């Protein structure tokens, strides 16, 4: 394969930091490369160097002769140009629509948008789609995409992954993409570059395969590095013990051993930056969370129906993912549950013990003039963790990645990912027992996302999450609902796969209106599903129920231990016994659901 872009010993600094240090890499025809790394470690800088927009401080960047590079930046400079000028150079519809690729991109990304309108009248998400469409249509040899899935829903992300994978399979150029969307990276990329800091200098490690292969390969590298470090420490202990005994003088061998011992001390590898989210105490949650009866929710002017005559019961420990195309009202549903919006009709009953933590897409609750440490100490200077240990605000922040001068940095000077991290930490300080999370993955790097997912795995409360990040959704939620339009909120036993399949079936039905579709045989049944598809759906639903049963068994075991420890505290014992009874009732309901599902 021909090399299209080469980096030779490239170094780039920013202030006192070295973001890239003597990095040598190549992009060849047919490559599909995913770039991962912590926020601020130099991913966007690397893209700028690859495209030629950023000159390195030293080293060389070469492009093959006549190379065309399409670059999707995180911002744009379209000014007041029309959408048609940006994406198809002003060509009329009958000209650009003759090209099937252009037509597909416009239909998928810009459906319903007037191409003769001005870009400066669009929302941020719509501008992002215009920029992405322009790059995809441009006929470039290399596509360099910085966070292309931002502002896209799961359906469009799935289309984009298929579009880019088809381009790579046809060997029509190369792709380099920065994304925090791990499902997307796994679906599209065949190579992964990790940008990280080693000894204060930015480096790039290359791994074969997509995100899943990268995780396994990195874990193996870390295991080998840990083994080597263990050997180094054992040898160092022996050498230091020998030095403490006092080496005999006037021989060459002791001089050699002293030098070797000093080298062992000097070569201690620096620790990789890590992010730790401490486990906070959680307020006790009773048996009632949310009960919706005959709810109708309308938003906007003129009123648009989001929910119509919906009955929905959400219990303790439920973990729900909510999906739907952009604009269907997912955020409005969360705001209604949080009490910020009132239903147009019907009732929303909230449990007496609810303590809701609502993570909004906006960061309005953060005062940009506050310093990071003050923003946490204003909530709590000392926090009690789940195990009873107390911890200071400064230590909490340092564990969660706010080290050094970041503690005294003003919030307005933080990156989007850092502000989102701070927002999540402040939310947990209030010890909520219900979390409503609206696009929680926005701006966060993969390491931080993994830490939050691990935290939510063991969190005992109720979680309702809206996200376009399919990996996060499937990791955090046990059940998926979809806002499908017309006021409906449908349970999807088959998860996101069923949602995408149903949406594809709806599009096909609209294109062939005379074709008759068999009626659904029950709630959650796929439209005209084959026996094999039905078996897959049932298997997935059984797996979901079994996962919930496993979690409840763990909670019951923990309650038994707590009851044994509180044997002499009759008040606490009664509280624990009530919780145990509720868990056992939930377990019974789930076992009944399992039997019904298994019977088909």
Range-by-range predicted roles:
Residues 167, 217-250, 254-260, 264-268:
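Intracellular alpha-helical coupling/juxtamembrane segments of multi-pass membrane proteins
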Residues 239-248, 276-282, 290:
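Alpha-helical coupling/stalk and coiled-coil linker elements that connect catalytic or binding modules
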Residues 1-227, 281-529, 535-600:
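ABC ATP-binding cassette signature C-motif
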């Amino acid at each position: 394969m021909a090399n299209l872009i080469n980096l030779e010993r490239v170094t780039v600094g920013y202030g006192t930091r070295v973001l890239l240090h003597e990095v040598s890499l190549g992009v060849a025809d047919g490559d599909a490369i995913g770039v991962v790394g912590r926020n601020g470690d130099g991913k966007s800088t690397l893209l700028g160097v690859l495209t030629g927009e950023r000159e390195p401080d030293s080293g060389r960047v070469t492009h093959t002769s006549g190379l065309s590079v399409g670059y999707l930046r995180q911002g744009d400079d379209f000014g007041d140009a029309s959408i048609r000028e940006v994406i198809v150079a002003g060509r009329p519809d009958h000209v650009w629509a003759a090209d099937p690729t252009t037509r597909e991109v416009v239909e998928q990304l810009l459906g319903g948008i007037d191409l003769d309108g001005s870009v400066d009248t669009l929302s941020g998400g719509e501008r992002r789609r215009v920029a992405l469409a322009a790059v995809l249509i441009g006929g470039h040899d290399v596509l360099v995409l910085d966070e292309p899935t931002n502002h896209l829903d799961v359906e469009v992300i799935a289309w984009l992954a298929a579009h880019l994978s088809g381009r790579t399979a046809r060997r029509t150029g190369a792709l380099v993409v920065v994304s925090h969307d791990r499902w997307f990276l796994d679906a599209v990329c065949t190579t992964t570059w990790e940008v990280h800091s080693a000894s204060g200098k930015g480096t790039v490690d290359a791994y074969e395969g997509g995100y899943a292969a990268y995780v396994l390969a990195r874990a193996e590298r870390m295991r080998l590095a840990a083994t080597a470090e263990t050997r180094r420490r054992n040898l160092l202990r022996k050498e230091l013990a020998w030095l403490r005994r006092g080496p005999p003088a006037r021989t060459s061998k002791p001089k050699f051993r002293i030098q070797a011992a000093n080298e062992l001390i000097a070569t201690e590898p620096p620790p990789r930056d890590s992010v730790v989210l401490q486990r906070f105490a959680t307020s006790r949650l009773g048996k009632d969370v949310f009960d919706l009866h005959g709810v109708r929710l309308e938003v906007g002017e003129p009123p648009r129906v989001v929910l119509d005559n919906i009955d929905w019961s959400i219990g303790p420990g439920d973990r729900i993912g909510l999906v739907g195309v952009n604009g269907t009202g997912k955020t409005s549903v969360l705001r209604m549950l949080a009490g910020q919006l009132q239903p147009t009709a019907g009732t929303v009953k909230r449990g007496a013990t609810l303590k809701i933590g609502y993570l909004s897409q906006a960061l309005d609750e953060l005062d940009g003039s506050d310093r990071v440490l003050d923003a946490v100490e204003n909530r709590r200077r000392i926090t009690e963790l789940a195990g009873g240990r107390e911890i200071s605000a400064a230590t909490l922040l340092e564990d969660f990645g706010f080290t050094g001068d970041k503690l005294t940095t003003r919030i307005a000077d933080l990156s989007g990912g850092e502000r989102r991290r701070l927002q999540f930490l402040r939310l947990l300080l209030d010890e909520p027992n219900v979390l409503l999370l609206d696009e929680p993955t926005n701006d966060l790097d993969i390491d931080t996302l993994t830490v939050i997912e691990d935290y939510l795995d063991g969190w005992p409360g109720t979680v309702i999450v809206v996200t376009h990040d399919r990996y996060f959704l499937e990791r955090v939620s046990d059940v998926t609902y979809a806002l499908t339009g017309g006021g409906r909120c449908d349970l999807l036993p088959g998860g996101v796969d069923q949602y995408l399949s149903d949406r594809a079936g709806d599009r096909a039905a609209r294109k062939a209106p005379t074709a008759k579709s068999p009626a659904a045989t029950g709630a959650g049944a796929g439209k005209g599903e084959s026996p094999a598809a039905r078996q897959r759906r049932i298997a997935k639903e059984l797996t979901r129920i079994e996962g919930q049963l496993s979690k409840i068994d763990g909670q019951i075991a923990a309650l038994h231990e707590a009851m044994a420890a509180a044997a002499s505290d009759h008040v606490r014992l009664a509280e624990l016994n009530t919780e145990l009874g509720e868990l056992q009732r939930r377990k019974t309901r789930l076992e009944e659901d399992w039997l019904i599902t298994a019977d088909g």
